[in-house]
UniProtKB/Swiss-Prot annotation:
Pfam families the record matches: Ferrochelatase (PF00762)
GO cellular component: cytoplasm
Protein name per Swiss-Prot or TrEMBL: Ferrochelatase
Enzyme kind, highest EC tier: lyase
Record's function text: Catalyzes the ferrous insertion into protoporphyrin IX.
Gene Ontology process terms (BP): heme biosynthetic process
Organism: Rhodopseudomonas palustris (strain HaA2)
Alphabetized GO MF terms: ferrochelatase activity; metal ion binding
Binding of Fe cation, residues: 215, 296
InterPro entries given in the database record: Ferrochelatase (IPR001015), Ferrochelatase_AS (IPR019772), Ferrochelatase_C (IPR033644), Ferrochelatase_N (IPR033659)
Keyword Ribonucleoprotein attached: no
E.C. code: 4.98.1.1
Gene label: hemH
Subcellular location: Cytoplasm
Length: 345
């Protein structure tokens, strides 16, 4: 009898499980509470960052600890109280950033090795806590996503600073990538245009013009080489082209100046005041540089600047919501993330 013994080749190698990749969305920050104490803690951290206030000399430190932190927190606490999410006992920025991370994670649910999280540069959840949490979950690669369409040393760069500050204390560091600014990305410009059209369609009036208001910064920072202003201009130029508007129908301004130095101009509040005095009666304001609504959009623009407009003769005013966690807003972030994850997936 002949016995045939089957010959088996080597067992096929199992494909290695994909490495876990952390995706960390980062926005500016928020106090933990809307009382004076909570705002003081937040402002101390924020205003002590040399990327934000570049001259951190003895005179600034005396002013910060002697005057600013003893007067400004009470005023800003009142502003936060006007917009505070009472149900969750947190700022809208925290609520929205969490929602952005959750919806981004849901849109990437078919990629089980991706772990999406979120953090604040100042305040909580801190970048340190969330980076350490991602590493503890086995993420050997980390994509940090600064939620700023336009780059500035005072925003995007300080996110990088903090990420490296955390990583340099780790023995086993994850590989790190950081998403670039997306100030002219088609998806971003399309999302802005869509959000403006959608919001205007809900209004009982037609604005005579639209103001595009960006967070300001000291003019001196631009003179030192910060590209922020040029990127804001590029965003508005692209938005004008997409919407078929000229520079008289879509204006570019800068808000939120602080201190006595000259900041980027034209100033939003002064422009809105002049428009009203010049006879503009119906106005809308969009804030393209903010990925999520926050104190600067919900209180400074939607309340303070609306009051300025009305007080000087304006009749109808509307602040257009930021992209937030809208479908278009999440699509912008998702495209940015997927592009930067190439080679890791």
């Amino acid at each position: 009898m002949t016995v045939i013994v089957p010959i088996h080749g080597p067992a096929p190698a199992l494909a290695p499980a994909p490495e876990r990749v952390g995706v960390l969305l980062v926005n500016l920050g928020t106090p933990d509470s809307c009382d004076t104490k909570g705002v003081r803690v937040y402002l101390r951290e924020f205003l002590s960052d040399p990327r934000v206030i570049e001259n951190q000399g003895i005179f600034w430190k005396l002013a910060l600890n002697g005057i600013i932190l003893n007067t400004r927190p009470a005023r800003k606490a009142k502003d936060y109280q006007k917009i505070w999410n009472q149900e969750k006992n947190e700022s809208p920025l925290k609520t929205i950033t969490r929602a952005q991370a959750e919806k981004l994670a849901a849109s990437l649910s078919d990629r089980s090795h991706l772990v999406v999280d979120w953090a604040m540069r100042y305040g909580n959840p801190s970048m340190r806590d969330r980076i350490e949490a991602l590493v503890a979950q086995g993420c050997s690669r980390l994509l940090v996503v600064p939620l700023y369409p336009q780059y500035s040393a005072a925003t995007s760069a300080t996110v990088c600073d903090q990420a490296f500050r955390v990583l340099r204390e780790l023995r086993a560091q994850p590989t790190l990538r950081v998403t670039p600014p997306y100030y002219r990305d088609d998806a971003y410009i399309d999302a802005l245009a869509n959000s403006i059209h959608a919001h205007l369609a809900t209004l009982p009036f037609k604005p005579e013009m639209i103001v595009a208001s960006f967070h300001g910064m000291p003019q001196a920072y631009i003179e030192k080489g910060d590209p922020y202003q040029s990127q804001c201009v590029a965003t508005v130029d692209a938005l004008r082209e997409r919407m078929g508007l000229d520079d008289k129908k879509l204006l570019l301004t800068f808000q939120s100046r602080f201190g006595f130095d000259q900041w980027l101009q034209p100033y939003t509040d002064k422009t809105i005041e002049k428009l009203a005095k010049d006879g503009v009666r119906k106005l809308a304001v969009v804030m393209p540089g903010f990925a999520a609504d926050c104190l600067e959009t919900l209180e400074e623009i939607a309340q303070e600047n609306a009051e300025i407009f009305m007080h000087n003769g304006g009749e109808e005013f509307s602040a257009i919501p930021c992209l937030n966690d809208s479908a278009d807003g999440i699509a912008v972030i998702r495209q940015l993330v997927m592009r930067e994850l190439e080679g890791w997936l």
